Amino acid sequence: MSYYKITDLENYFKMYKKSVREPRKFWDKIADENFTWYQKWDKVFEFDMQEAKFEWFQNAKLNITKNCIDRHLAKRGEKTAIIFEPNDPKEEAQHISYNELYARVAKFANVLRDQGIKKGDRVCIYLPMIPELAISILACARIGAVHSVVFAGFSSSAVAARINDCECKMVITSDGSYRGNKAIDLKGIVDEALEKCPTVEKVLVAKRTNTNVNMKAGRDQWLQPLLDDAMNTNVAEIMDAEDPLFILYTSGSTGKPKGMVHTTAGYMVYTAYTFKNVFSYEENDIFWCTADIGWITGHSYILYGPLLNGATTVIFEGVPSYPDFSRFWEVIEKHQVTQFYTAPTAIRALAKESLDYVQKFPLQSLKVIGSVGEPINEEAWHWYNDHVGGKKCPVVDTWWQTETGGIMISPLAFVTPTKPTYASLPLPGIQPVLMDEKRNEIEGNQVTGSLCIKYPWPSIARTIWGDHQRYKETYFSAFPGKYFTGDGALRDEVGYYRITGRVDDVVIVSGHNLGTAPIEDAINEHPAVAESAIVGFPHDIKGNALYGFVILKESGENRDRDNLSKEINQHISDHIGPIAKLDKIQFVSGLPKTRSGKIMRRILRKIAEGDFSNFGDITTLLNPEIVDEIKDGKI
């Protein structure tokens, strides 16, 4: 009996029990029967939750790209691996077969080696959603270089911080990128970032917008001529199961971003397994995840998960609103997409527009529709189910994180009965628990608490690059012996889970996790600002938006408030990127603080939400009178 594909609900419960009672046997069988290895493992896994140390498939040898590409060539060589759908619908889509993907990855891998990149070197990739992004990632994995993809919407200082943190030797970028009807100068952003990055020796530049850019002699080279001269075969590097595959930065609730390290074998096994089961993938399906590859969703479910299963995956360069709001539906129709995976923020934005946009396309090819990035609200769930899925496609509402590597709690299409707004049941191997404030596990159903996971799984991030102590403190100290997700959750009467939102200082805006601390740091660097505090508040489209409470220095007191608000948002945009801009800025004379100097954020959250009913005990505040002042000045 295959463990790899769950067939029905009874089979799910059977597999889930097996995965919990005999995890070594369960994962051993899945890894053994579905992947190509140079050498099998000595032990399936060993772990220490106190020290936050995890090893999976110990001493196994493999290369993930052989599993993504080479092993498919005999049977699926001419099958389309990647469909590239450009920003402009008038530009022709590209269909890249597995044979072509092999040749292009081999050439790119040879270029990297020729440029002095070796196993273990870090390479920063700052590219738009074009084929070169996927190919450069796979080329790094081919030669054992560690890829660190930075979302191409981040500012130069955010790029520099990420490059410096993991000491990248090379940057791969493009002359520019398209976003709707705008062209963006990516190379200019990289040039600015690299003024502060001493470790970068080489920059490879792909052509996308064909704009004039500065090329620094000795450092910058156009990519295409190098690829033209490279051989189209390449021997893959033999990697250890626990060798790092990539670093991906996620917002910290405190200070600098965290470089999550994912290693090779466990990540491979778990992303392949979850892709197959959550989306009920079958041969010849066309899978489209609308995320950017710069986020974990793109790594796991545009690239690695689909290719490991020999699937056809869509890479979409555009945005849902260009040239108009029918673009997603037009792409589904054009490429006969069978599984569609997007974010609630996109669903809400599209639901606001005329139904004509979606109704002019039959969307008969769709079998499964999915949601990712944040909990989906009931109204959006029903709109998505009714108008996109035609009430015949299961809605898989997936919960997971950058740190988890793959989907953790989700309905399995055609297996798990769905319930609006619920992520439902855990995947095999995942043991969620709810914890109370006294660190006790909450038993039974119809309860809420802090969501933790009490046993490791193959694709758990192994550490924060260069800072294992921070990794331990962030994820394993709040509830010793358990992984703390930072999310709150509710377990209903049948054991289904519903994510209720963050319980730390991270706000999810349009599906992006934004730590409040880095945004506050950016605001506080403005010469007119003394101090600031950021909280989230509900937003119809974005799910949450950011509300800033700002105290001005004396020098800023007489400044025009509208101009100051614009400058503050520009400051945030320059330091972090446009995604972190504030929707509302309220200038205040003080912030509610405890006697130890801690800002009482729950009060600010309530004010931002317009809920003045119960601020709880404010006698512990140093300045309780400030609460009324802030409340009265609410925007």
For every predicted segment, state its role.
Residues 425-429, 440-475, 514-516, 612:
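Conserved ATP/PPi-binding loop(s) of AMP-dependent carboxylate-activating enzymes
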Residues 150-176, 190, 333, 340, ...:
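AMP-binding/adenylate-forming catalytic core of the ANL superfamily
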Residues 202-207, 541, 574-599, 613-634:
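AMP-binding/adenylate-forming catalytic domain of the ANL superfamily
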Residues 308-311, 338-342, 351-420, 431:
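Gly/Ser/Thr-rich phosphate-binding loop
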Residues 78-80, 204-205, 216-249, 256, ...:
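Conserved pre-ATP/AMP-binding loop-to-beta segment of ANL
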Residues 138, 142-225, 336, 343-344:
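Structural core segment of the AMP-binding/adenylate-forming
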Residues 268-286, 296-338, 352-355:
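Conserved AMP-binding/adenylation subdomain of ANL enzymes
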Residues 65, 82-138, 155-160, 215, ...:
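Conserved AMP-binding/adenylate-forming core of the ANL superfamily
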